[in-house]
Amino acid sequence: MRKSVLIGIVSAFFFTATFILNRSMNLTGGSFLWASSLRFIFMFLILLLFMKKDSRKNVKEVISINPKYWLLYSTMGFGLFYFFLSAASDYGESWFIASLWQLTTVCGILLTPLFGHKIPLKPLFISIFILIGVFLLQYENILVSNMGNKAFIALIFVLIAGTAYPLGNRKMMAIVGDSLTAMERLYGMTLMSLPFWLIIAAIATYKVGLPSISQLFQSFLVAL
């Protein structure tokens, strides 16, 4: 129990750091196109460095069975998810995006029928109750910040990200089953989302030029 709580706290810390670093890159003139694509490019290189040869071979064999599904759901679960989450940082403060991200729990529960199960009402009500609490805590900050239409755009982007993330990941888990470990599945999805990220990186180069040293460093920290 203590181990689970500790893992949850550490995970929450690193995810919160992601929102802060994304906002920091935005405020210093960095493009969200680079913020999103660099995170997964660096992440792939890090995983490539630490994955054993046998594990990489196993992943490639599993991918070869259903390459189209891997490409689709990896792009959805990693690509669309992080693209829109990074884009949201252009329209709201890190605390606001972090608060909105709690919506992903509700989105994940509402997607349950797509996997042949009924919506679990108790977890749904608990998640909604938590969301109400988060909203009440941040309501005054929202009024003071005077974000206006930007808050609505950020909400839409986070909803897209919050839907793509659980849908893509759970679909991949259903396809893979027990044939891969969690780390191998992470490596495989990162690998198969690379075509999407390379396209985003090419668009970023065309629109804003190459990323700054500061953005490269911060993106590397997010990837870690």
PLM feature segments, named:
Residues M1-L38, S145-A174, F196-I199, L221:
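Glycine-/small-residue-enriched transmembrane alpha-helix faces in small-molecule transporters
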Residues I7-A12, W70-S74, A98, S127, ...:
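Residue-level signature of transmembrane alpha-helical cores of multipass secondary-active transporters
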Residues F19, D54-W101, L136, A223-L224:
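Specific transmembrane alpha-helical segments of multi-pass solute transporters/efflux pumps
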Residues L21-F32, N58-V59, D90, Q138-K150, ...:
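Membrane-interface helix termini and inter-helical loops of multi-pass transporters
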Residues T28-L80, C107-L111, F129, T163-G168, ...:
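Transmembrane alpha-helices of multi-pass small-molecule transport proteins
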Residues W34-A35, F40-I41, L85-K118:
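Specific alpha-helical transmembrane segments that line the substrate/conduction pathway
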Residues L47, L121-N141:
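Hydrophobic transmembrane alpha-helices of multi-pass small-molecule transport proteins
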Residues S55-I65, P113-K122, M173-E184:
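Membrane-interface helix-boundary motifs at transmembrane edges
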